[in-house]
Amino acid sequence: MVVQTNRPFGRVVAIGATAAMACASLVAAPIMAQAQSNAQVSAKKDVQVIAFQQTWNTIAKECTETYGPEGVGYVEVSPPQESIQGTQWWTSYQPVSYKLDSKLGTEAEFASMIKQCSAAGVNVIADVVLNQTTGSDVAKGEQAGVAGSKYNGSTGDYPGFATKQYPDGITAADFHSCDKNISNYTNQQEVQECRLSSMWDFNSENEKVQDIQSDYLVKLWNLGVRGFRMDAVKHIHTDSMKAIKEKFSKKIGQNANDIYWIQEVIGNSSEAAGIQPGNYVQNGTVTEFGFKSEMNQYFKDKVAKLKGLNERLSKDLASKDANVFVTNWDTARNQGALTYKDGAKYQLANAFMLAYDYGTPRLLSDYKWDDGHNDDGAPGATVASVPDVDMNKECSTNNSAWNCEQRWTSTRGMIAFHNYVGDAEVTDWQDDGGDNIAFSRDDHGFIAINNGKKEKDVTYTTSLADGEYCDVYATMDCSKTVTVKGGKVETKVPARSAIALYAGATKASHPAASTATDPSDPDVSKIDDEVTATDKTITIYYKPADSTWKTPKVHYGLGDDWNQPEADMTLDEQGYYRATIDTKGKKIDFVFHDADTDQWENPEVEATTMPTPVSSRSVWPARSCPSAIPSPSGRRPVS
């Protein structure tokens, strides 16, 4: 288990390393018809599915058979440009040219995919890498990319980026002069001009670089891409990003503000002011990492604490500016987020996201991986290619190599719910202070979530009109219904489950489906908390708010016993102190103490003397997740 924070107090129940990090942070036509009918009454269609490391041919078919009929608004594809060779997924994030021949398919296949997705009513978002090229630790000397483009990762020569205007491509002169790895995130210049995990850092202020990169975006646009997810934007100055976008918009004759722009910026209040997420909304929307932290925190604690989430997150990013997710490919593989391995809690968190009224929701279609193999590429990947996947076959069971989240019964139902309720406000919030919550979306929809281990008899108030509604979380054929009478819902909510109702799916009038549930639905019959973890250690990461601290230590208690020696913390290359503690299977409370200055810190109070632990806190504050997680050499880190 890993805890990372720049805040100093937390309490966690030790549940093992394979749990998540606590942070201070067969498809039948009738099934498709169900989703399509829901989409026809949609007030909104903005759900995004991240089709991670899937080929263009695979995505094209899934657009036609699943995403379009379900009412998905966008599918996000992995970086389409040529990259370094390697089986690992992160090789896609080390470009060697902007040729559209990659491990995931050819330019012709890419164009065909876009046409097929568009015909199904699904727009394509491209994951775009503009910050860096290759890492010197994995791409030394003369090498070739997956499409054969030559480059030299030692000298910084990349002729594959050549254009008519710049026939020599990219040379060392087109990168920032700083050749050291980023270590101090309080220094904006270092973050934006030095190297992220040894990767050559484009001089984004350079007009030549801006021209080459804007030409790449034009090429994507002309092929039909209608959204751009900009990778590692924190490492690019806002003015430089604005200049690239403006060059791009002028070349295609569009208003820059009308181009859908998603920027990956991981916020951390302890870092430089100029790299905070709010600075980037001038150029487009921003990924809100705080949302996934809250999901991870409270679905492992008390979901009732999600009350007021919109207001909390809106202090940093307005809902219209935020893209939210329960997990993405990075966070899933680096702890700090719920994943499919968390079973029903993961499903419930995604249902909450699709039911709630904050941000634009992003789902993840991903393959499964074993612990310790987080860098592994898609099943069957070679150093230069990824095989096509027959999702109808892979998703005909729940034990294949792929995690078919996009086809789960709950996902289908909640996308329809989300589209139907549109911008209706959250009303009628109710909770029991613990594992059960419920709320309406005005008179459009209602959801109740039971995150507990026992079935719950509930009586909730709802703004839905009286009637018999399909429970779209549980079934696709309306074989399970819930009645609203007198503005009340009286029912039983199964353990680790939910009920979801919306005005467009009633017993009297509902979409047709031949099957109650999808065969890809995960098996969540085992209540996860009943399994005792074998790893009872916890690793705590901490960055002191006070720069005068030189020898921070962890002062901690196990259970009610605070007679433990203080744990020494060691400084890592990214500026975080860390300590690993054996919890002996007990809850752990901790504060931080600097031995030199004899100062103490916790997140609840400003303290210069030893503070009293706040025992009511059960996990780390969600807003204090750090910007980076230490990564093996050569991989693209969460940054």
What are the roles of these predicted feature ranges?
Residues M1-A14:
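Bacterial Sec-dependent N-terminal signal peptides
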Residues A17-V27:
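Hydrophobic core
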Residues S25-Q40:
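Sec-dependent signal peptide cleavage junction
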Residues N38-V49, W56, E62-G68, V72-G73, ...:
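Active-site-proximal helices and loops of the catalytic beta/alpha 8
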Residues A43-D46, S83-K115, N152, D157-N203:
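Aromatic- and acidic-residue-enriched carbohydrate-binding clefts of CAZyme catalytic domains
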Residues K536-I540:
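Structural beta-strand segments of beta-rich domains
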Residues Y541-K584, A595-T609:
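Aromatic-rich carbohydrate-binding modules that target alpha-glucans
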Residues T608-V614, V619-A622, P626-V638:
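Cationic, amphipathic, low-complexity alpha-helical segments enriched
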